[in-house]
Amino acid sequence: MYSGAGPALAPPAPPPPPIQGYAFKPPPRPDFGTSGRTIKLQANFFEMDIPKIDIYHYELDIKPEKCPRRVNREIVEHMVQHFKTQIFGDRKPVFDGRKNLYTAMPLPIGRDKVELEVTLPGEGKDRIFKVSIKWVSCVSLQALHDALSGRLPSVPFETIQALDVVMRHLPSMRYTPVGRSFFTASEGCSNPLGGGREVWFGFHQSVRPSLWKMMLNIDVSATAFYKAQPVIEFVCEVLDFKSIEEQQKPLTDSQRVKFTKEIKGLKVEITHCGQMKRKYRVCNVTRRPASHQTFPLQQESGQTVECTVAQYFKDRHKLVLRYPHLPCLQVGQEQKHTYLPLEVCNIVAGQRCIKKLTDNQTSTMIRATARSAPDRQEEISKLMRSASFNTDPYVREFGIMVKDEMTDVTGRVLQPPSILYGGRNKAIATPVQGVWDMRNKQFHTGIEIKVWAIACFAPQRQCTEVHLKSFTEQLRKISRDAGMPIQGQPCFCKYAQGADSVEPMFRHLKNTYAGLQLVVVILPGKTPVYAEVKRVGDTVLGMATQCVQMKNVQRTTPQTLSNLWLKINVKLGGVNNILLPQGRPPVFQQPVIFLGADVTHPPAGDGKKPSIAAVVGSMDAHPNRYCATVRVQQHRQEIIQDLAAMVRELLIQFYKSTRFKPTRIIFYRDGVSEGQFQQVLHHELLAIREACIKLEKDYQPGITFIVVQKRHHTRLFCTDKNERVGKSGNIPAGTTVDTKITHPTEFDFYLCSHAGIQGTSRPSHYHVLWDDNRFSSDELQILTYQLCHTYVRCTRSVSIPAPAYYAHLVAFRARYHLVDKEHDSAEGSHTSGQSNGRDHQALAKAVQVHQDTLRTMYFA
C-alpha cells in the first residue's frame, strides 16, 4: 500500500521531550530547490539600502489617553515645532501614532523623563495635552546587517519595527491608514458599491527581511469605505428608496432594524451649528419618530420637563424639521439620551467598512479591483514613482535609500503530477497550465447509486416536472459515462416549501426507503433552506445531500453536471482520481497522514459568535479520502484549543481505515499571521505530540508543521512576455520561488499552484515552523504542489493543498450548522448563541456531525 518511487527518506529524528517553557525554533532552510525549469520573474519588493547606524528609541506617554492615532500624530507634530529650540533642533523624529518615537540623533534629555505641555488649537476651544518622553534603547542597524548575512541567528524584531515606523511616518500623515495599507478617496471619480459604501484605492507597504537585503513590499490595494454623505441619503441607499420623498410615514420595524444594523457604530457630524461640526458615534436608532421621541429637558427654572426632539430643535435652533416622521440617531453613550434628527447629520468621511459586504457589493468590488498582472505591475511601478521615498525628508533623515525598480527573481516551474483514473482503460491525465479534462475517463472508484430521491424547493411553475425529468435523464447519462451508474429512477420526487418542511420530509425519507444513498435538493436561489438541509442531513439524520440551483436544472450544461458528479461520487465514498503512484515523492514509502487545519472567525463587528476550528486528516495512501473534526471555540481565538483531541480522533480513524499507524504527520495550518507563529507553533505542536503519546506511550511519528498563507501582498510577474499565461497574463501554474525575497534563514517558499483566471495570481506562502522529517526543499515543494492537484471538486490544481482547503470548507459548513431556523442564511443572520444565548455546550453539539456522516466527505 505504501510503496513509492525514489530514494528512501532519512528516518525521522526523534522529537525532543515536550518541555513546557521551551521555545520551539523554526528549522533553518535545508537547501535551495533545483527541480523544474527556470523562469525569470519580478517581485513587488524594492531593495532598501540601510546605513549601519544606531537609531534612538523613546517612549511617549500622552495624557489624556485613548486619542485616535491621527490626533496623537498632530500632538507630536505640534510638540516637535514648539520645542524645537529646547529639544528637537533640526531632528525629524518619526512616530507610530501610539507610544514609540525614533530619532537619528539622540535627544539632549539623557536618560531622564521629560514632561511637556502641548496645545492643539480646536474647534471652539484649544485642547491641552501632557506628553512625557523617556529614552528606551538604542536600536542597532548593524545588528540587522549581521542577521541578514547569517552572522546572527535571528532577525531582531525591534529593528524591523523601527524601520517600518520611519517608512510609514509621512504616508500616515497624508492618507488614511488601515492596517499596513494607506487609502484615499479617489479624486474626481467615485466607485459606489451601493448601501452607502464605496471603494477606496490605496497601497500596502511593509518592511520585510529577505536574503541579504531589507526589502520594501509595495502593492496596490482596495477596501470598502462609507460614503461621506447626508444621513438622509444614506437611509435611501440602505433601504432602496429612490428619494426620501417616497417615505411619507414612519419606518416599519423591519426597515428600522435594517437601518440600525448599518449605521450603528458609525461616526456622524452635525450640520445645524454653523462651523461647529461636532462629531458623534451612533449607538442606536430610536423606535419613535422625532415628532414623538422625548427626552428630559432642564428648564431655566431648574425644573425638568419631557420635550420632543422636533419641538426642541424648533425652540432652540429655530429649525422646523422636514422629516419629523423619521426616527432619530441616538449618539454617544446609551445612558445619556442624546438624540439627533437624521436630517442634521452627515456621515463622517474616511470610515472603513468592517461589516460583511453583500454578494452584490462583493462582485462589484471584484470587478472594480481585478487587474491583469501586467496592469498591476504598471500600477505598482507608478505608485513607487509617486511615493518617491528617496525625497521623503523622514526617510532621508535616517539615511535610507529605496531602489525604484522591482526585484528580479529566478523562479522554477515545477512539473505537474500525472492523474490516474479508473474504469477499463485506467486513463492518465496530464495537467496543462493547472487544468485537465475528464472526458473519456472514468472515476478511479465509482459508486453505484441504487436508491436516491429528489426534493424540489423551487416553485413548480418555474421548475416544472418536465425540467425535473430532463435533468434526471441528463444526470443518469453523464453518471454512466463517468463510471458511477445510477440504477433506475429516483424512488421519490416531490415539491416542498420552506425550511420548516426539511426535517419532517427527510425523516419520512429515511424511515421509508431502506438503503437511501442520496437526496438531491433543488433550491430557488439563495435561501434559508440550504442551511437547514445541511443541518438536518449532516448533523441530525446523517444523510448525504446534494443541493442544485434551480437555474442549473432548467438549463443543464455538461460542465455543471460533471461538477455535480465530482461532488456526489466523493460524498458517497467514491474516489474520483488519484496521483499516479510512481510519480509521488519518497514520503509515501511509509504510512503518512496529511492534516489540514483552519480557524474561521465571524465577521468583524460581531462580538458574540464563536470562532470555528476544523482539522481534516487523510484516510488512505493516495491521499484522496479525508475525515473531518470540528469544534466551536472562543470568539476570535486563533489557536486551536482542542487540537490534541481532534488529532487523536483522526489518527484513530486513519488506523481503522488503513490498519497502519502513520510514521509521519504532515500538518498544513491555514490562517496564521506572522505575529502568531511562535504562539501557535508552541501550543499546537505540543498538542499533536500529546495526541500521539496518549494513543501509545512510545508512539512518536515525525511531525512537519507548515503554515500556509494567502493573505499577503507578494505578487510575481513574468519578465518575459512570452511566459505570461491566459487573458490576465499571469505566471504559470507551478511557479516556485525560494530565493531573494524569502526569509534570510528560515525554511519558506512561495508556490503559485493554480492558473490565475481573473486578476493577478496570488502565490501561496509556505513557512515550515517544525520539521522532524528533514524534508529537502525540492521534496516539500513537489509534495505541496502535488497535493494541490487532489482537490475533489474540480479537475484543476487549486491555490492551496487539498487538506488545508477541506479544513476551510468544514469550518464554513459548521457556520451553516449553527444557523437558527427562524433566521435567514449564514451570512446575514444571527448565529445561535447570540439570539437566544445558547451556551457553549449547545453550540458544540450543534456542530457535531452525525455518526453516519462522520466518515464521509460530507463537506465536498
UniProtKB/Swiss-Prot annotation:
It is an enzyme of class 3 (hydrolase). It holds the Pfam family Piwi. Residues 9-30 have a biased composition (Pro residues). It catalyses: Endonucleolytic cleavage to 5'-phosphomonoester. A divalent metal cation binds at residues 598, 670, 808. PROSITE patterns: PAZ (PS50821), PIWI (PS50822). SUPFAM superfamilies: PAZ domain, Ribonuclease H-like. Keywords: Cytoplasm, Endonuclease, Hydrolase, Hydroxylation, Magnesium, Manganese, Metal-binding, Nitration, Nuclease, Nucleus, Phosphoprotein, Repressor, Ribonucleoprotein, RNA-binding, RNA-mediated gene silencing, Transcription, Transcription regulation, Translation regulation, Ubl conjugation. Interacts with DICER1 through its Piwi domain and with TARBP2 during assembly of the RNA-induced silencing complex (RISC). Together, DICER1, AGO2 and TARBP2 constitute the trimeric RISC loading complex (RLC), or micro-RNA (miRNA) loading complex (miRLC). Within the RLC/miRLC, DICER1 and TARBP2 are required to process precursor miRNAs (pre-miRNAs) to mature miRNAs and then load them onto AGO2. AGO2 bound to the mature miRNA constitutes the minimal RISC and may subsequently dissociate from DICER1 and TARBP2. Note however that the term RISC has also been used to describe the trimeric RLC/miRLC. The modification Phosphoserine is found at residues 388, 825, 829, 832, 835. SMART domains: DUF1785, PAZ, Piwi. The modification 3'-nitrotyrosine is found at residue 2. Residues 1-30 are annotated as: Disordered. The Piwi domain may perform RNA cleavage by a mechanism similar to that of RNase H. However, while RNase H utilizes a triad of Asp-Asp-Glu (DDE) for metal ion coordination, this protein appears to utilize a triad of Asp-Asp-His (DDH). Residues 312-317, 525-567, 710-711, 754-762, 791-813 are annotated as: Interaction with guide RNA. Residues 518-819 form the Piwi domain. Residues 230-349 form the PAZ domain. Its EC number is 3.1.26.n2. It is found in: Cytoplasm, P-body; Nucleus. This is Protein argonaute-2. Gene3D superfamilies: 3.40.50.2300, paz domain, Ribonuclease H-like superfamily/Ribonuclease H.
